[in-house]
Amino acid sequence: MTAPSSTPPTLPIWVRAADTLTVLLGLLTFQAWLFGGVRFWFISVSDPWRPLFALLAITTLRHYLLRSPPLHQCVGSWLRATWPGDALAATWPTVIFTRLSVLLVGYLAVVSIGLPEGAPPFRLSDNEAINLPLRWDTGWYLNIAMEGYQWNAETEGQQNIAFFPGYPLVTEGLANLLGAQHVMRPPLDRPPRVAMEQFQQIFLGSALLVSLLSFTGGMLWFYRLAREYMNDSASRSALLLMSSYPFAIFFSAAYTESLMFLAVIGAFYHLKHERWVSASIWALLAGVTRPNGFLLAGPLAVIAFQHIRKKRPTSATPEKVVLNSLGICFATVMPLFGLLLFSGFIYSLTGNPLEWLEAHTAWGRSFTGASTLMLPIDSLSERGLIQYTSAQPVEALNALSALLACSLIWPVMRRLGPEYGLFMALNV
């Protein structure tokens, strides 16, 4: 007996559109029933009945015109093709164990060791488990998600325009789906302070959920990409290394690292498999998630060149060649377009498209190029190893990580390809 195919059946475009709309209406129905509806731009759902009636009408018409394959079979085929069983089996134990371990250790550290003396960090609750994700720059991302970007020309201190919008936008969308829009809507059924705390806690929980889900999705694509270069055992080892190296702590934080990881892996994987639309979406997300996201255009250009060179002797029609080339180029420039979009927005807000870059000086950060790598070397030669690492432990750790990454560029390039080596070189 042959196993069922995991490849989604080829269907007319109207059937795929109807099935997609049906699934979305089903999700909206469930959301409205559980969380009271949602409002996005021109879409407003306040009760589950309207999307439910629309779902039933579209499903009935679709199956009347095309009974086979039914909707549930198409959805199952798509899920099996997108997230194969081997990828799930390899990924979920590593993801769950490492992410929960980081959160558990963090919580135990807070309740057993305590917080530093002085003013406690910003808190949303008396429960330290709820406050745990609220560290470092998380408050800035939540501020953008809840209140949007704000800029004051007379303020010389820190302002939220220094942070890119991808992560706050996704967080805001998820928080609204989880009912945040209804918490502060009058008339309030609880004291304003309690309502505001609940509102903020929904956003904080949504931010952490975005990070954890993004990391999970990124690890699934990471495993599939790794399997194209190595066997299953080595791919599983790569998953473990990715999720447990020292800086992987940020994959369990309400930070941009997880979303950026997902966007980069998604862009790499889909461009390599010639899925131009999906690759473009992931590449654009990378461009609006972190300041270095636009650098992804370099490695994507290498992949695009490889595709074009590989398909030069082809029997395809000129029209198909042109469309294929346009798709490749479009996906390649999306990270740059994301940077331009954010810079254009900042220009409309401040009159300077690079004001977001200048805002980093309030944190004492500035771009100094390769000289950043030379400063630790100079300090090391002057002070000696023990004195330098004792005086600057964080800088020493960062310098060691940078040197290790630089030493791996050539082996990675030789083993996996120039696109990966270039990605490392651009992001050290």
Predicted region positions:
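Transmembrane-helix signature of polytopic, membrane-embedded enzymes
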Residues: 182-205, 217-244, 262, 419-422
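Membrane-interface helix-loop-helix junctions at transmembrane boundaries of multi-pass membrane enzymes
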Residues: 9, 311-330, 407-425
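Hydrophobic, aromatic-rich transmembrane alpha-helices
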Residues: 382-418, 424-428
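Short hydrophobic/aromatic helix or loop-helix immediately within or flanking a transmembrane segment
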Residues: 132-150, 154-199, 372-378
